[in-house]
């Protein structure tokens, strides 16, 4: 079973990563990352702010990040992706409290999609950046990052699928990031967990809760190491429960009553 998740806009490069006795890994697709960096370096703060719809302060920060980005990734300029991303998904995942065995399992069974890096293993080193997959960054391959990455992410995802040993892919990424995957080109049964929260008597997807729940589902996978879709249905973290009637063969619906 392989799970995929989105990255996060919020990053933490100040807090030291937990110390495990295995080495961090090198991101595989940095030759492509360098091409994107070279394009992004050409933007002024105002141009980048307009492209990314971000504040002047964030635009200036990311112009500096693009200028400082280096092809070589080491312990001084980088941090393992699993511990660098901080956002709602990663709050639910709570990577800092994973055991050594769970992190080892994650190295094989978890991947992060990325606008800049394409596909990251949990312990791949990464440098601070902001480049969302939906950014309309014109490049030699087309009008946006979906055109830039083409089949590359899908091919590397297939390699990861082959290495981990079965054909179950658990899609816990946002639609924006999953759009960079070409499911028809994957030899995989793709399972999509959906998390619904009760609001005024009706169950609906609430972005903040759904993101956190996706992280909790990753945590559940790393802790329980399920080998079948049936075992995923046992997920009950955060008071969610599996709704058999609302689910289908590849869409697993989890619900939670309104929080008091």
Swiss-Prot record:
Alphabetical list of Pfam families matching this protein: H2O2_YaaD
Coiled coil location: none
GO cellular component: cytosol
Top-level taxon: Bacteria
GO biological process, one term: response to hydroperoxide
InterPro entries: YaaA
Family assignment from sequence similarity: Belongs to the UPF0246 family.
HAMAP family hit by this protein: UPF0246
PANTHER family: PEROXIDE STRESS RESISTANCE PROTEIN YAAA, PEROXIDE STRESS RESPONSE PROTEIN YAAA
The protein's name: UPF0246 protein APL_0602
């Amino acid at each position: 079973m392989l799970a995929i998740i989105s990255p996060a806009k919020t990053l933490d490069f100040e807090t030291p990563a937990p110390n495990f006795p295995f080495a961090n890994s090198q991101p595989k697709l940095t030759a492509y990352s360098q091409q994107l960096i070279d394009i992004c370096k050409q933007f002024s703060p105002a141009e980048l702010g307009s492209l990314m719809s971000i504040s002047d302060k964030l635009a200036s920060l990311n112009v500096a990040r693009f200028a400082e980005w280096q092809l070589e990734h080491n312990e001084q300029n980088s941090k393992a992706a699993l511990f660098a991303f901080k956002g709602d998904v990663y709050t639910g995942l709570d990577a800092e409290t994973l055991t050594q065995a769970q992190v080892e399992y994650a190295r094989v069974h978890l991947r992060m999609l990325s606008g800049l890096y394409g596909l990251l293993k949990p312990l791949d080193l990464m440098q601070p950046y902001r480049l969302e997959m939906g950014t309309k960054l014109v490049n030699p391959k087309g009008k946006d990052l979906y055109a830039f990455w083409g089949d590359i992410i899908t091919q590397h995802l297939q390699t990861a699928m082959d290495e981990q040993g079965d054909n179950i892919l658990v899609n816990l990424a946002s639609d924006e990031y999953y759009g960079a995957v070409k499911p028809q080109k994957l030899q995989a049964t793709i399972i999509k967990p959906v998390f619904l929260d009760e609001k005024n008597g009706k169950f609906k997807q609430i972005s903040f809760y759904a993101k956190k729940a996706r992280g909790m589902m990753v945590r559940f996978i790393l802790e329980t190491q399920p080998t079948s879709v049936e075992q995923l249905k046992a997920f009950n973290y955060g008071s969610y429960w599996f709704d058999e009637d609302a689910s289908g063969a590849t869409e697993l619906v989890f619900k939670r009553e309104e929080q008091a």
